[in-house]
A protein has these predicted regions:
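ABC ATP-binding cassette signature C-motif
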Residues: 1-199
Length: 199
């Protein structure tokens, strides 16, 4: 649940919110609608990073688990030849590498207890995001998004709408309890917008 109570926030020469209150309950979809410059992205950033902003009122975030976030801005490294599959696999591969490193350390360690605790923590995190089946889950999600033949395609070769869908898939695959999308329909044509709804 996210709850704002009499939230006020302003820039030096512009007031964005004046005693705004709202509640976003669990298991619901909510959209903030407004023209450019009305503070939608600022509100998202306040929810994600409340300590970075000076505001009046109360902002409460009670989300027991991961929070996913899809930004409206993302710059790709044109020199980095990364495929869709590699991009979607990154979190899982990092956790697998951590598990392997811990196992290697356990082979020569005299005190196994701290390593066992670390191993269990990383393994729990891996299993919480269905890590054993991440490859098949990537296939399934790309198919739902209408991108089933895109696994080996370079990110730099995707259209804006295609990359937006891949971003959403990446966040959804870490099994967030709550996901925030800033301007999720940016770059999406009608076909890709329907694919976003299917995800």
């Amino acid at each position: 649940m996210i709850k704002a109570e009499k939230l006020s926030y302003s820039f030096p020469q512009k007031e964005l919110y004046n005693k705004v209150s709202f509640t976003i309950e669990d298991n619901v979809h909510c959209a903030f609608i407004g023209t450019n410059g009305t503070g939608k992205s600022t509100l998202v950033d306040m929810i994600l990073h409340p300590d970075d902003h000076l505001y009046e009122g109360k902002l409460t975030m009670d989300v027991p688990g991961r929070i996913g976030y899809v930004s409206q801005f993302y710059s790709l490294d044109e020199e980095k030849e990364e495929t869709v599959f590699t991009y979607l696999s990154e979190t899982f591969v990092q956790l697998q590498n951590q598990i392997n490193e811990i196992c290697d350390a356990m082979a020569t360690a005299e005190d196994l207890e701290p390593l066992m605790e670390k191993y269990q923590t990383v393994m729990d995190e891996f299993q919480a995001i269905d890590g054993d089946f991440y490859e098949s889950n990537i296939h399934k999600q790309l198919k739902v998004a209408g991108l089933k033949d895109y696994e080996d395609k370079l990110l730099t070769h995707l259209s804006g709408g295609e990359f937006k869908l891949v971003q959403v898939i990446r966040e959804m695959m870490i099994s967030p309890k709550f996901i925030i999308m800033d301007e999720p329909d940016v770059f999406l044509d009608f076909e890709h917008l329907n694919a976003l709804k299917d995800l």
